[in-house]
């Protein structure tokens, strides 16, 4: 059974702890997958996510079909952790079984999870996706930890083969690599001094 294509998200953190103080920030990650096939006959889809830091093990999956969206029952989600003994990295493989027979073209599967980062200054984001997906966007929502209403700063990242990442007024070249038909996007993101909540949203769309 072929998969619907996957996105591999790896979060590599550089930890800086000053004055023996530990501070944490929660990063919520959303991955959206669309079909890489014209016709879907599969009844399941799987993806891999590396959890390099301990955090919430809960993964909430949504199936979006047209204007409808609903949470996929956890009994339809199979999880397996694979440990790389050399690096100590655990890769979680999730398999999602359709509740409605088969997945259809342009179905979106949104997966939400979160991890705790301790005194994090820099995070490298690495994503792998089949080259058929030519549109790639990253949105960052800054939510100050203060009780006041959070600011909604949204930054979008669009890439076709090569592109640029824009954060505020700064623009950084987006690095891409191709390996066995899989395009990999890379960018290092520097967290602000204050610890805020960031929401990362990836969208993978098949070309028209």
Q: Predicted regions span which residues?
A:
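Lumenal/extracellular ectodomains and adaptor appendage modules
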Residues: 1-208
């Amino acid at each position: 059974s072929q998969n619907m294509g996957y996105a591999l998200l790896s979060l590599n953190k550089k930890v800086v702890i000053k004055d023996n103080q530990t501070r944490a920030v929660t990063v919520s990650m959303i991955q959206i997958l669309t079909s890489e096939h014209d016709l879907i006959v599969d009844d399941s889809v799987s993806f891999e996510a590396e959890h390099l830091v301990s955090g919430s093990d809960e993964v909430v999956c949504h199936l979006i079909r047209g204007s409808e969206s609903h949470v996929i029952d956890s009994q339809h989600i199979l999880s397996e952790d694979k440990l790389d003994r050399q690096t100590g990295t655990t890769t979680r493989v999730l398999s999602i079984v359709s509740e409605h027979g088969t997945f259809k073209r342009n179905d979106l599967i949104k997966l939400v999870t979160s991890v705790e980062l301790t005194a994090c200054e820099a995070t490298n984001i690495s994503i792998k996706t089949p080259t058929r997906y030519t549109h790639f966007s990253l949105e960052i929502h800054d939510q100050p930890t203060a009780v006041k209403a959070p600011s909604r700063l949204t930054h979008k990242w669009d890439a076709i083969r090569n592109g640029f990442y824009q954060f505020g007024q700064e623009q950084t070249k987006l690095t891409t690599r191709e390996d066995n038909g899989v395009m990999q996007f890379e960018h290092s993101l520097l967290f602000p001094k204050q610890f805020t909540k960031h929401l990362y949203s990836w969208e993978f769309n098949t070309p028209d």
